[in-house]
């Protein structure tokens, strides 16, 4: 059986997201022109949570969308017809916007690279910033997060899992050894 360690409990996750929300506001001098885009699946739920924090702080709703990266992944060689493809849902234009791309765990950077490609196919934002709940290191690509909830150095054989409840609210972050 895997040895599991809770890295962040529910209140720790909330504190991390609140801090990220404040950092996003500070860096962008408010919410004007700001949109949130979560990477399916975990990043979407975290983007929604981040949007709620921004409303609590600023009293203004920030548009929130989702990007699916299935067809942009670089670890798929042909035979893509059998892949479960999610849906990219951007109920707003990203043209000229400040996009905050949100994901649960940053590891090799390959998911983020795929998300950047998918976003650029949707338009040309003025900037793209990256917010992640956990950065575990081990990059294969030169990608770094602008906003990080928690840095958790891991070995390549370990895994980080962000758990969500039935309402898709993050409940804890677990290190699996």
Swiss-Prot record:
Sequence motif PRPP-binding, residues: 99-111
InterPro entries, per the entry: PRibTrfase_dom (IPR000836), PRTase-like (IPR029057), PyrR (IPR023050), PyrR_bifunctional (IPR050137)
Pfam family, one: Pribosyltran
Entry keywords, A to Z: Glycosyltransferase, Transcription, Transcription regulation, Transferase
SUPFAM superfamilies reported for this sequence: PRTase-like
Assigned protein family: Belongs to the purine/pyrimidine phosphoribosyltransferase family. PyrR subfamily.
Functional summary from the UniProt entry: Regulates the transcription of the pyrimidine nucleotide (pyr) operon in response to exogenous pyrimidines. Also displays a weak uracil phosphoribosyltransferase activity which is not physiologically significant.
Protein name: Bifunctional protein PyrR
Species of provenance: Geobacter sp. (strain M21)
């Amino acid at each position: 059986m895997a040895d599991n360690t809770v890295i962040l409990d529910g209140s720790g996750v909330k504190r991390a997201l609140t801090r990220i929300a404040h950092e996003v506001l500070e860096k962008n001098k408010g919410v004007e022109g700001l949109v949130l885009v979560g990477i399916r699946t975990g990043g979407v739920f975290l983007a929604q949570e981040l949007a709620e924090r921004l409303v609590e702080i600023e009293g203004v709703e920030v548009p929130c969308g989702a990007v699916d990266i299935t067809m942009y992944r670089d670890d798929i060689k042909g035979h893509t017809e059998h892949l479960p493809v999610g849906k990219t849902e951007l109920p707003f234009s990203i043209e000229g916007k400040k996009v905050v791309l949100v994901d649960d765990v940053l590891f090799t950077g390959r998911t983020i690279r795929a998300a950047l490609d998918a976003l650029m196919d949707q338009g040309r934002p003025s900037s793209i910033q990256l917010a992640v709940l956990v950065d575990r290191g081990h990059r294969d690509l030169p990608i770094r997060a602008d906003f990080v909830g928690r840095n958790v150095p891991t070995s390549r054989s370990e895994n980080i899992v962000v758990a969500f409840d039935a309402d898709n609210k993050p409940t804890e972050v677990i290190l699996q050894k």
